[in-house]
């Protein structure tokens, strides 16, 4: 099949790569325009655009796609069989959805209709979901409201964070999308619609994964310890707090259970009721901080202008004192 691939971040590359290596022909890639992201106002290409350039594939980076007559006519002229969309970043209008022969399909990283929207992986971790997955969806004009052709569910591991879970789902999306393309090609002249599953028939709650905002990254020590842990995983590696006026990225923590607190090595912890207080500094354990509920151990962090540090090294770097306060 002749395919146009739509994608922008690194997450999308596994799917683009698997189709380039398949029997199908990727005749073009659509990605977001270059953006100014570094000092000196230098324009930076999206990861997908950079990858497509290495593969010598024609690239389109329209500033707008809705009512863009020139771009739409260009797409129509390519006689494309299938549009594959994975983390492109914009909702495609009806006039584009209707162009390809086999339709326009999206791989969404959640168990729809849970976590429709821009940041499903982040919110599945932040909210402590036990499972997630990938759904291959026939796109319509709504926000991730299309019918599903395929879906695969995976367990979210206790040690998963945004990086590790994104990698798993990126690989799963690629494999599932390739399988979906074969199904569409084989059954196109049969009743493809009969193979689709409507989201409202799955009995799942509809939730929305809004875009992550700058304010979301700040750790609120007044929350429950488990919620703080989930947030750090879901926003890895950008969750942060303020220590002595400097930004401190919190990369990994451990929640101390009630039983663990009874261990003799923690008995000398200062008793502070205020969240965000350093309760103890234990060389072989880490920095212990109070929350609304259980204390947490700061295992890995990155102080502004410094390298990532853990446990003993982090203690030597920060030189924290019992009773100091981490601000939110």
UniProtKB/Swiss-Prot annotation:
Gene3D superfamilies linked: 3.40.50.12230
UniProt GO cellular component terms: cytosol
Entry annotated with the keyword Transferase: yes
Family of this protein: Belongs to the Fmt family.
Native source species: Prochlorococcus marinus (strain AS9601)
EC number: 2.1.2.9
Keywords per UniProt: Protein biosynthesis, Transferase
Keyword rRNA processing (UniProt): no
Function: Attaches a formyl group to the free amino group of methionyl-tRNA(fMet). The formyl group appears to play a dual role in the initiator identity of N-formylmethionyl-tRNA by promoting its recognition by IF2 and preventing the misappropriation of this tRNA by the elongation apparatus.
UniProt-recorded Gene Ontology molecular function terms: methionyl-tRNA formyltransferase activity
Name by which UniProt lists this protein: Methionyl-tRNA formyltransferase
Alphabetical list of InterPro entries matching this protein: Fmt, Formyl_trans_C, Formyl_transf_N, Formyl_transf_N_sf, Formyl_transferase-like_C_sf, Met-tRNA-FMT_N
